[in-house]
Amino acid sequence: MGPSAHLISALGVIIMATMVAAYEPETYASPPPLYSSPLPEVEYKTPPLPYVDSSPPPTYTPAPEVEYKSPPPPYVYSSPPPPTYSPSPKVDYKSPPPPYVYSSPPPPYYSPSPKVDYKSPPPPYVYNSPPPPYYSPSPKVDYKSPPPPYVYSSPPPPYYSPSPKVEYKSPPPPYVYSSPPPPYYSPSPKVDYKSPPPPYVYSSPPPPYYSPSPKVEYKSPPPPYVYSSPPPPYYSPSPKVDYKSPPPPYVYSSPPPPYYSPSPKVDYKSPPPPYVYSSPPPPYYSPSPKVDYKSPPPPYVYSSPPPPYYSPSPKVDYKSPPPPYVYSSPPPPYYSPSPKVDYKSPPPPYVYSSPPPPTYSPSPKVDYKSPPPPYVYSSPPPPYYSPSPKVEYKSPPPPYVYSSPPPPTYSPSPKVYYKSPPPPYVYSSPPPPYYSPSPKVYYKSPPPPYVYSSPPPPYYSPSPKVYYKSPPPPYVYSSPPPPYYSPSPKVYYKSPPPPYVYSSPPPPYYSPSPKVYYKSPPPPYVYSSPPPPYYSPSPKVHYKSPPPPYVYSSPPPPYYSPSPKVHYKSPPPPYVYNSPPPPYYSPSPKVYYKSPPPPYVYSSPPPPYYSPSPKVYYKSPPPPYVYSSPPPPYYSPSPKVYYKSPPPPYYSPSPKVYYKSPPHPHVCVCPPPPPCYSPSPKVVYKSPPPPYVYNSPPPPYYSPSPKVYYKSPPPPSYYSPSPKVEYKSPPPPSYSPSPKTEY
C-alpha cells in the first residue's frame, strides 16, 4: 500500500473510531473514554477503528501537545479500548495499533512527556482485551506505530516513556495474547544483558531478575525447562547490571520473569534467541534524549508475556506477571523515560528462529524509520534501545528467516537515520549491529543481503552527518565486500558502481579537491592491467618494502580525493566478486600498514603511490591471489591508523574500536559484508577478511575530506588532479614529499 493509501486508511480509521467511540456507546459494555487534553496542541491523526466495542477506550491526554497520527482501529471490541494518557507538552499519536477484536478495553496510552507522537502502531487483529497503554512521561514522545496485537484476550502492555521526547513509531504487534505482555522499563543509563538462560517450558512465570547491587552480571541464568511454580525473582536495583545471556523461552505457560535494571548503564550484549515464543517480545528501552522507533516487529503468536525489563521507573509493582498467550488481562506498560524517543517502525519479524538483535542508539538523534520486518517469529523480537537524545530508525533490513538473532543496532550519534537497511532474506546467524555514533547519520538503503550464513556487517558512522543512500546489495560474495569509510562531517553514499567481475582490483579514487562528485564510477568488468595511479603530493614517503603482489600485469592507480565533501549516493551491488570491493577510507589520523601481501610472481616492482599523509604503515594488506605485478600502495592522509589485518567494518569515527572476531557464517561463500568506518582517533584491525579469488587487489577508496559526495564514483578513466604520472609499464615508485611513510 502506498503512502496515500496508508494516509486515507488512517483518516478513515480515525473517523470511524471517533464515530464509534463517541456516538455508538450501545456497542460498548462500558462508557466511552474521557478525552481530557489540557495540551496546547493535540492532533488525532488516526484513532483506532473500533469495529465492535463492548466498551469505549478512555483516552487521557493531559499533555501540552498531543498528536494522534493514527491510533489502531479496533475491529471488534468486547470492552473499551485503553485510555491514552499523554500529560506531556507535546504528544503525537501517529497510529496506535488497531485492535481487531476486543474482549476488554485496550490499554491506556500515557505520555506525560512534552511531545509524544504515535505515528502508526500496528493493527491488532483480534482483541479480547484492551491494547496496552503507552506511557511516555517525557518532554516529547512519539508513538509512531505500536505493534498490532492480532488476538488479545487482555489488553496489550502500556508503553511508558517518561523521557523528554519519545516516539513509538510502531511497536511490535502481538498476534495472540493469553495474558498481558511484560512492562518494559528503561530508566537506567546502562544495562548489559549478556544472555539470559533460555527457558524451555514454563508452567509458571519465570523469575524476575532483581539486582540491588552496585554491579551485577548475569553471565547465564539457568534455563528453566519446566516450571510448576514461578522461578525466583532476581532483583537488581544496582547502577550497573549485565545480563550476559537472557533465556530464550521456548514455551511459556506463564509469563517470563521481569528483568529489573535500575542501573545507569544498560548493554544488551546478546539477547537470547528464543526459538518458539509462547511469550511476548522483549522490551524496548529508550533512555535517550530522543528516540524514534518507527515500527517494532509484530509478534504473531504469544502464549505468554515476555519478561519485563525494568529500568527504574517511577514506581510499578508487578506481583505476578500474567502469562500472555491469549490475553485475559492487560499487557504490561512500556516505560521509556528518555527525552525523546521515536519508534518509527521496527521490523515485523515474520519468521524468527531466534530473536532479532537489540538496536542500541545512545546518540542525540536517531531515526529508525523502518527496521526489517522479520516474517516469522519463533521468538520475540530484539529490544530496541535508544539512550540517545534522538534516534530514528528509518527502515532496518527485514530479515526474512532467522536461524539466530539479528545483531543489535547501535546508534550513539546525535542524529541517525536508517532509511532502509538491507533486508536479509535468510539468516543463519544474526545480522550485524548498526552503529551510528555520529551527530547525524542517514542510512538510506544498505544492501539487502539475500542469503546470509553469517550476520551482516555493522554500519558505523560516528561522523557529524552521514547519509547512506543505498549501499550495494551483495548477492553472492566470493570475497568480502569493501569497507566504506567516511570520517567526514557529512557523507552521502548515493550509489557506488556495481562491480561484476574483477580480473584486477578497481583503482582507488582520490580527489584532493574541495568538493568532488563521483557521478558514476565505471563497473570494471575485467581488468587486464590496473588503471594508472593518481598522486596527490605528499611531503615524504619511504617504502621499506612494497607489498608483493601475486600476479600483476601492472599496478592499479590510486584515486585520491581529499575533498571536504563526499556523497555516496548508492554503493554498487556486487554480484560476484573475483576480488574484494575497494574499501572507502575517510582520512584517519594515522595509518600503519605493517605487512603487505607476499608477492607470488613479480613481473616488475610495484610503483609507490603517495598520499600526503604524515605517516602510514601497512601492517598486512590482504594477499591477492594472482598478481602479474605488485599492487600499488594506497594512502589516506590520516593521522594514525593500524591495519593489522582487519575486516572492512563500516566505521564511524570512534575513539577506539576492536574487532575481535565477527560471527561465524554458517553458510557463506564469502565473509559477511564489511562495516563502513568513519575515521576514528585510533583503530586497530586485528584481521581483515581474506579475499577469496583475486585476479588483482581491490583499490581502497579514500576520502579524507570534511564532506564528500559519491554520486556514483567515476570510472577509472577519470583522474583527479595529480602532479603527473605516466606508467608505460609497471610504474616506478614516485615519491611525493611526505613526513614519513613506511611499508
Curated annotation (Swiss-Prot):
GO cellular component entries: extracellular region; primary cell wall
Induction: By wounding and water stress; in response to plant hormones 2,4-D, BAP treatment; in response to L-Pro treatment. Repressed by salt stress.
Region of interest: 24 X 16 AA repeats of S-P-P-P-P-[YT]-Y-S-P-S-P-K-V-[DEYH]-Y-K: 79-660
Segments for region (23 X 9 AA repeats of S-P-P-P-P-Y-V-Y-[SN]): 70-628
InterPro entries in UniProt: Extensin_dom
GO function terms (MF aspect): structural constituent of cell wall
Localization in the cell: Secreted, Primary cell wall
Coiled-coil positions: none
Keyword terms: Cell wall, Cell wall biogenesis/degradation, Glycoprotein, Hydroxylation, Repeat, Secreted, Signal
Segments for region (Disordered): 46-93, 715-743
Major subcellular location class: secreted
PTM: Extensins contain a characteristic repeat of the pentapeptide Ser-Pro(4). The proline residues are hydroxylated and then O-glycosylated (arabinosylation). Synthetised as soluble proteins which become insolubilised in the cell wall through the intermolecular cross-linking of Tyr on adjacent monomers. Isodityrosine (IDT) stabilizes and makes rigid the part of the polypeptide where IDT functional sites are present.
Entry function: Structural component which strengthens the primary cell wall.
Record family assignment: Belongs to the extensin family.
Descriptive protein name: Extensin-2
Recorded name of the encoding gene: EXT2
